[in-house]
Amino acid sequence: MKKILLSIFLCLPFLLSAQPYTIKHLSIREGLSNNHVVSIAQDKRGSLWFATEEGLNKFDGIRFLTYYKEETTGKQSITGNELNCLLDDPVDSILWIGTQRAGINAYNYANDSFITYRHNENNPESLVTDDITKIIAASDGNLWICTYW
């Protein structure tokens, strides 16, 4: 009997202090560019980034900001709207974005700028292909890039 009462008293604080989880469903109704999300990352500022089949989406907890490929304005942007993967750089304020057939984009969210890395058949140091499937941070500060090649 003592063991039963002791077990109840030991478990009771855990049961009483439990907080209910709140789950917020995010979709195109809330501003997401597409319901087909292929990758999610959280940056150092707490924003959530969603890679979709129709652009890059930043969610600040209240609203979405969508980044699309800009072909007509000349504005700096991502190189493609069909995305495969995201990685928040463990050191710098950079979000690495792997695309389908459009290389890698490095988005610096500290100064709102993009750098693009593409395959160049004349440069053996470039990406082997523009189809990027996964980006992984190595412990030595380098990146592992997975491709369809």
Model-derived segments and their meaning:
Residues M1-W149:
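Carboxylate-rich, polar loop motifs that coordinate divalent cations or form catalytic acidic clusters
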